[in-house]
């Protein structure tokens, strides 16, 4: 059933954590759960893909401590969230307090996403933006996979569903590179889903990213830098023997010149 169940929910408590971490009495639990939904919706409207200033929001984590709410916003563009002189955070905090209608203290911690091309939600968001601009889905998927491989992921799978390229009959196409072991619980798999609204209808984008295995008691291995992941051009390997021969000939010519 690893192919059917949600990859993140399947691994909660093993390789993934809950996005909302707090406890409440049963009477207040529905109210606080709705507050979390409103907070995430507000942040998505102000800084998400459809906002005027898209900050590339990847994830919003919420913690509650008495009358205090701690928000951790993971974004690809922290400068857009913070704003000039911190005005962006202050405006966001004021809007959230007005949304909740209370004087509870809200703390916002902005965390930059180190590997944008290895984040499943940001990849799905990028594909949705390109599809809404009527770019060929095959080209967008191929570019996203290449960028993810350069970012150091061990495997990636992308699925696009709907009226692809304006076809009369909807269909589903997917592409996979590397390993994506959905049955392995210790596998660190990032999953996300996004929709693209086109003139032909809504397209669904699903992205699975396999970043490696997390063994209990060991720290997860960081993704290697992009510079190390770039493969050498095979033509350079053919050029190396030629360069060595040219250097030897030059050295022999210089030795003969010195002897003369």
UniProtKB/Swiss-Prot annotation:
Domain KH type-2: 39-114
Keyword check for Ribosomal protein: yes
Annotated Pfam families: KH_2, Ribosomal_S3_C
A cellular-component GO term for this protein: cytosolic small ribosomal subunit
Biological-process GO terms, alphabetical: translation
One GO MF term: rRNA binding
Keywords recorded for this protein, A-Z: Ribonucleoprotein, Ribosomal protein, RNA-binding, rRNA-binding
Basic and acidic residues: compositionally biased ranges: 227-243, 251-260
SMART domains: KH
The protein's assembly and partners: Part of the 30S ribosomal subunit. Forms a tight complex with proteins S10 and S14.
Functional note: Binds the lower part of the 30S subunit head. Binds mRNA in the 70S ribosome, positioning it for translation.
Protein name per the record: Small ribosomal subunit protein uS3
The species this protein was found in: Nostoc punctiforme (strain ATCC 29133 / PCC 73102)
Classification lineage: Bacteria, Bacillati, Cyanobacteriota, Cyanophyceae, Nostocales
Record gene name: rpsC
